[in-house]
Amino acid sequence: MNLILFGAPGAGKGTQSELLIKRQGMTQISTGDLFRAAIKGQTDLGKKAQEFMDKGQLVPDSIVIGMVEEVLQKGVQNFILDGFPRTVAQAQALDELLVKMNLSIGKAIFLEVPMRILMDRLTGRRVCKNCGAVYHIVSKPSKVEGKCDLCGGEVIQRNDDKAEVIETRLKTYEEFTSPLKEFYKKSGKYTEVDGNRDTEEVYKEIEKIIK
């Protein structure tokens, strides 16, 4: 089954995607990872995406759709779309792309988390500059402060995880992404999961939904 996993920044999409990859053999298509790889490689799309991400703004559809299409053209199956689509316009463009490629989405799962919890999660998040491993200063700190447990790389706070940018990101999310709920409710593929719980509890509920 192909899934869309969506919710506000910090809702736990990446964490749940990792579990689905390890336990269900699924493939994650994370637009955030695609952006960061493009930025690190200093590609044309990466440079354009960085300008928007650093301000906490949504990356334009033309850039996002292009990156997703490139991945799907490699023949990926049983995938999770993490962080995409973020708007109804993107969802419509995705539907057109999937029809063209003879693919479909089985479920669109929304992770619901209160705004104050999202702020706490995001401002405390730290990421390895080298391998992308994710930590949290309270719930999942690295063993040595500022150093990645996995590769020894520098652990930093991303620009888009700073308080002033987060506030913009969450407001942008509410404005553009919330209508996605209605879009997928109409398609009959929408399911909501309480993301403000233990990681395992959230995973078990998602597992039931996809079986």
Curated annotation (Swiss-Prot):
Q: Where in the cell is it found?
A: Cytoplasm
Instruction: Write the record's keywords in alphabetical order, separated by commas.
Output: ATP-binding, Cytoplasm, Kinase, Metal-binding, Nucleotide biosynthesis, Nucleotide-binding, Transferase, Zinc
Q: Name one GO biological process term.
A: AMP salvage
Q: Which residues bind Zn(2+)?
A: 128, 131, 148, 151
Residue sites binding AMP per the record: 31, 36, 57-59, 83-86, 90, 158, 169
What does the record give as EC number?
2.7.4.3
Pathways per UniProt: Purine metabolism; AMP biosynthesis via salvage pathway; AMP from ADP: step 1/1
Superkingdom of origin:
Bacteria
Q: For ATP, which residues are the binding ones?
A: 10-15, 125, 134-135, 197
The record's top EC class is: transferase
GO CC, alphabetical: cytoplasm
Known function: Catalyzes the reversible transfer of the terminal phosphate group between ATP and AMP. Plays an important role in cellular energy homeostasis and in adenine nucleotide metabolism.
Q: How the protein assembles, per its UniProt entry?
A: Monomer.
Similarity field: Belongs to the adenylate kinase family.
Its protein name is Adenylate kinase
